[in-house]
Structure formats: structure tokens, C-alpha cells
Amino acid sequence: KRIWKKALLLVQFVATGFLVTMLVFVARQYTFMVNDRPGYAYENLAYCGLAGVDSTSRAKILDEVMRLPGVAAATTVYQLPFEHASGNNILLPGGTQELFNIADLYWVGNGYLDMMEIPVIQGRSFTENVTNSREVMVDRRFVEKMKLVAGWTDDVVGKDICVTEHSKWNEEPFTICGVYENIRLGGISNQDMRPSVLFYAHKPMYTLQVKFHELTNDNMARLQQKISETFPDRELSAISFRSEIMDLYKDSRQFRDSVMIGGLVTLLVTLIGLIGYTNDEVSRRRKEIAVRRVNGATLWDILRLFIKDIGYICIYAVILGGGIAYFVLQKWQ
């Protein structure tokens, strides 16, 4: 019976070591995910989808929002960086061979790169307030890809490319005006590694993007109020970038919470089992304890009997549980 209780205690400590180790690693991974820099500054950004809103109304809300207190900048975009990006293919002017597929971020408005704090590492940003812009910006990955497939050098500014969907059968090339630093498209676990491109649009696009001096509840409330006043017949919501980015990792958060609950329950069961085992041992060894007390043993001497009895079991069990957790985490990642 005593051996059976020790075996059960061993299993409980292995489970505790496993779940505690899992919790530490998963919690650290989740913290890393939500605090990692994606290549753009999102802490003070918010957005509002304007799908179905006409161009005149989009221009109106953009103008109204820029006058709100606390707003540092506002623009419109077609694509948000954490959304899934559509693809188009790259060709050289006059050529028919499609070189590679890119993540097309489509159109952005005035001041987009400054708002996002995305560095321009070569050339310049778009010429703004142009009705039919023929400029395109590419990221660092695009430059590296063109060096491999087309033999280009690092200096790509001023060169022309054609992009399917935009260039109409390779008849309307775009001129590269600048190169921006790579940014993360999507989340860490499902990052889109394709090169990306940006186009400029003077006409307001379908997503309003706002940058605050500081993103506070009051500033978000004012933005939401202005949107609701401008479009009383529509249910449009202002959403912070941070909440959307955290939502990318909700599965990891839920897994972390599940492991935490499981770990706490297992720890509680283990403590109950340890207390029960200790009580049984005290009852079983009552005469031995009495003799030791008569011979001058202190309370600490008595406690050492039980610590020595189960201490090695606990240590080895926790190490074993941690090792199993590490193996599982390697497979999971």
C-alpha cells in the first residue's frame, strides 16, 4: 500500500512539473508574440472599415477626424498589414514571363509610411496629391528577389516593373520611387514571407487609419463618436491596432489559460495527495517518532525523516515532467 501511494505521488509530481514547465514556456512565448515589433509602430494606431461608404463621404470623415483633438495624423488605406494580403505577379516591361508572386498591399494615402514609422531605406516616398500615380514602392525582400531572378543590383529606384491586375497586360509599367524596410504581414505564426509592394491613391480608400499622440479611452471615444455622427445609419466601429494584433494570438492565449488552469488543479491535487501521504506516514511511524522525541530529537529532525523519504521522489518527478514538457514543446513549435 505504501509503494502504491508513492507511485501515485510520483505521477502527480510528474504532472505538476510538466504543466508548470509548459505554462512558463507558453506564457513567455505569448508575451513575446504580443510585444514583438512587426516593423511598424502600432501602439497609437486605430482604424475603421469604410466598406460601402462612397468616396465623398470617405473624404469627409477623413477631414473631420484630422481635426479631432489628440489626433496626430489620419489617412486611408486599402489593406492593413495584419490582414491576409492578396497576391499579384511581377513582370518586366515588354516581357511575358511572370517572375514571382508578391503580397499586394494595394493603395495607401498621404503620409502612410510616416504614420506607420516604416523607414524608407532607398529613394523616397510617394509624390502625393497626384490623381493617377504611376509610382510603386517595394520592400527590401523585393530588391533581394529581383537580384536573384532578374539580375538587378541593389539600386532599384527609377526602374520600371509591371504588376498583374495593375498593369493591364503589361502595357502600363510602374516606376519604383523608393524601397521601405520589411514589415511583418500577418502574425508571427502565419507570417507572409512574400515580397510586398505599395501603390499610392489620392482618392480615399476603404479603411480609415488614425494615429493618436496617445491612444487613450477618451481619444477612442471621440473618434467613435465622430464616426457615428457622420454615418448615423451605419454601424461602423473604431478598433485599435493593438487589440487586433493581440487577437491574432488568441489561440496561444487560450492555450496558456488552459495550461494555467490545468496546472493549478494538478498542483492542488498534488498538495492534497502529499498531505494525505504525510498523515498516513505519521500514523504508521507514530511509535518511531515517539521514541525519537524521548531520545531528544527536535521537530526539524522529525521533519527531515519525511523530507528524505519523499524529497528525492519529488525532485526526480519534477525534472522528468519538465523534460517531457520540453520535448512536447519542441514538437509543438
Task: Cite the ranges covered by each PLM segment.
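Intracellular coupling helices
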Residues: K1, I272-I313
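Short juxtamembrane loops and helix-capping segments at transmembrane helix boundaries
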Residues: K1, M33-A41, T298, G321-Q333
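Hydrophobic alpha-helical transmembrane segments of multi-pass inner-membrane transport and secretion
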Residues: W4-Q29, R253-K287, I315-Y316
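Small-residue-rich transmembrane alpha-helices
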Residues: F18, R28, K308-Q333
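"Rare, low-scoring activations can occur
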Residues: S55-T56, K60-A74, R140, E144, ...
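Beta-strand-rich non-transmembrane domains
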Residues: L99-I102, D114, R124-V138, G158-N182, ...
